[in-house]
From Swiss-Prot:
ATP binds at G45, H46, N47, G48, S49, G50, K51, S52. ATP-binding (A) component of a common energy-coupling factor (ECF) ABC-transporter complex. Unlike classic ABC transporters this ECF transporter provides the energy necessary to transport a number of different substrates. Forms a stable energy-coupling factor (ECF) transporter complex composed of 2 membrane-embedded substrate-binding proteins (S component), 2 ATP-binding proteins (A component) and 2 transmembrane proteins (T component). Belongs to the ABC transporter superfamily. Energy-coupling factor EcfA family. It is found in: Cell membrane. This is Energy-coupling factor transporter ATP-binding protein EcfA1. Its EC number is 7.-.-.-. Keywords: ATP-binding, Cell membrane, Membrane, Nucleotide-binding, Translocase, Transport. It comes from Mycoplasma mobile (strain ATCC 43663 / 163K / NCTC 11711). One of its GO terms (molecular function) is ATP binding. The keyword Nucleotidyltransferase does not apply.
Length: 274
C-alpha cells in the first residue's frame, strides 16, 4: 500500500452506477463505499442484488457507467488498469473454471511463471503455499481427481502465490458441499488473521459473512446497510429486504426455550448444557 497517506482507503467507490447493455435498470445505483486496508469485508445480498457486479468493477473487469473507483488512492482507468489489477486477486464461484494447470503444482506455478520467478524460488513458494492450504500431498494430482473444496483451495494458493494486496472471494463456497465449505472458510479465516491483506467476500451465506470485520448489504443495486456483522445480522428488517437467511446456529438458538439467540456455537452448546 502507498505510504503517502496511511488513511487512504485501499478501495474507494464514489457514486458508482453500472447498467448492463441488455438491462433496463442499474445493476449498481449510486454506490459509494470505502474498504479499509487490511480488513475483511463481506458483501451480502440476494441473487441480482449487484454484489458480483460490484466485485467485477473493483477488479477492473467491468467499467462503471458513471462514477469513479480508486485502488490504493489511484483512479482506476485505462492508463492505470494493468498496474492496479496486479494488486488484486479474484477467486470465482466455479472451481472448474479457474483451474488452468494440468496438475495442482502447475496451477500454482502458472502465475509465478508469468512473473518470471526463478525456478528454485518458485519451488519453495509452491511447497510453502500448498502446505498452507493443505494440498502439499496432491501436487501431482490432476483436477478431475480433486473435490470442489480442494480445487478452491488450489485456486486460493494460486492467488496467494502472486501476493496481491486485495483478494476477492466471489461466492467461493456456493457450489461446495459442507466439508468443502468448512475447509475454504477455515482458510479464509487463516488469511484474515495472519496476512496483511484486504479481503472481500461476495456471498449470500450468513455463516460466511459473520467471519468478517464488517458487512455490507446490497439490495436492488443499492447499499442498504453497513456495519458490524452481529449488529447487521440481528436487524430483521435488513435481512428481510436483502432476502437472506440467518446463520444456522442463530436459527437453532431462536427455537430453544430459555436460550438467548446467539451466533456463537460454543456459547449455544454451553447454554444447552446448563
Amino acid at each position: 500500500m502507498s505510504t503517502d497517506n496511511i488513511n487512504t482507503p485501499m478501495i474507494e467507490l464514489k457514486n458508482v452506477k453500472f447498467k448492463y447493455s441488455t438491462g433496463t435498470s442499474f445493476a449498481l445505483n449510486d454506490v459509494s463505499i470505502n474498504f479499509p486496508q487490511g480488513k475483511y469485508t463481506a458483501i451480502l445480498g440476494h441473487n441480482g442484488s449487484g454484489k458480483s457486479t460490484l466485485s467485477k468493477i473493483i477488479a477492473g473487469l467491468y467499467k462503471p457507467t458513471s462514477g469513479d473507483v480508486y485502488i490504493d488512492g489511484i483512479k482506476l482507468q485505462r492508463s492505470t488498469l494493468r498496474k492496479l489489477q496486479e494488486k488484486i486477486g479474484i477467486i470465482f464461484q466455479n472451481p472448474d473454471n479457474q483451474f488452468i494447470g494440468a496438475t495442482v503444482e502447475d496451477d500454482i506455478a502458472f502465475g509465478l511463471e508469468n512473473k518470471l520467478i526463478p525456478r528454485n524460488e518458485m519451488k519453495k513458494i509452491i511447497l510453502d503455499l500448498s502446505k498452507r492450504v493443505g494440498m502439499d500431498k496432491y501436487l501431482d494430482r490432476e483436477p478431475q481427481y480433486l473435490s470442489g473444496g480442494q480445487k478452491q483451495r488450489v485456486a486460493i494458493a494460486s492467488i496467494l502465490a502472486l501476493d496481491p494486496e486485495i483478494i476477492i472471494f466471489d461466492e467461493v463456497t456456493s457450489m461446495l458441499d459442507p466439508k468443502g465449505k468448512k475447509e475454504v472458510l477455515k482458510l479464509i479465516r487463516e488469511i484474515q488473521q495472519t496476512r496483511k491483506k484486504t479481503l472481500i467476500s461476495i456471498t449470500h451465506d450468513m455463516d460466511e459473512a459473520i467471519l468478517a470485520d464488517r458487512v455490507l448489504v446490497l439490495a436492488e443495486g443499492e447499499l442498504i446497510a453497513s456495519g458490524d456483522p452481529l449488529e447487521i445480522l440481528k436487524n430483521e428488517r435488513v435481512i428481510e429486504i436483502a432476502k437472506i437467511d440467518s446463520p444456522f446456529i442463530y436459527r437453532v438458538s431462536k427455537l430453544l426455550k430459555n436460550v438467548d439467540p446467539t451466533y456463537d456455537q460454543d456459547k449455544l452448546i454451553g447454554e444447552i448444557c446448563k
